[in-house]
From Swiss-Prot:
PROSITE patterns: UPF0054. Its EC number is 3.1.-.-. Zn(2+) binds at residues 105, 109, 115. This is Endoribonuclease YbeY. It is found in: Cytoplasm. Pfam families: YbeY (PF02130). GO terms for cellular component: cytoplasm. Its main location: cytoplasm.
Length: 141
């Protein structure tokens, strides 16, 4: 198993806890990590990746790439801490809560969940809430 986490910003983030959350969500979905890289970055990198791979010329909260099928996950996820901070303010939640929600969201994409339709978004939101309650309670941080 290889899970590597990189923080390319100056913002402090709970790296060990984020790794535990990623492992926990994937494990609960019946998956294991084979080779996964999690990059917590700023808007510049997020925009570049979003433009290059999805042809969207703007930064986004998360971009997730799954490179294989099956139970052993190989992939990458990129999370913009700038967008996480903006969304935390917009939704009136803490930066940490939003960071965990977006990390869980990314892990769910790795597990095969989509969010293109209203129904899929609602299902993912329910799963995010469930995993936030499981792994991200204040006493477990």
């Amino acid at each position: 198993m290889s899970l590597e986490l990189y923080n390319t910003t100056r913002r402090d983030i709970p790296e060990q806890k984020l790794m535990q959350v990623i492992e926990g969500v994937l494990g609960a979905e019946g998956l294991v990590i084979e080779d996964l890289t999690a990059v917590y970055c700023g808007n510049r990198l997020s925009r570049r990746i979003n433009c290059e791979f999805l042809q969207h010329d703007y930064p986004t909260d998360t971009i997730t790439f799954r490179y294989n099928d099956g139970e052993a996950v190989e992939g990458e996820l990129y999370i913009s801490l700038d967008i996480v901070a903006e969304n935390a303010q917009r939704f009136n939640v803490s930066f940490t809560d939003e960071l965990f929600r977006v990390t869980i969201h990314s892990a769910l994409h790795l597990a095969g969940f989509e969010d293109t339709s209203v129904e899929e978004r609602a299902s993912m939101k329910d799963k995010e809430d469930h995993y936030l309650n499981c792994f991200c309670q204040e006493d477990s941080l």
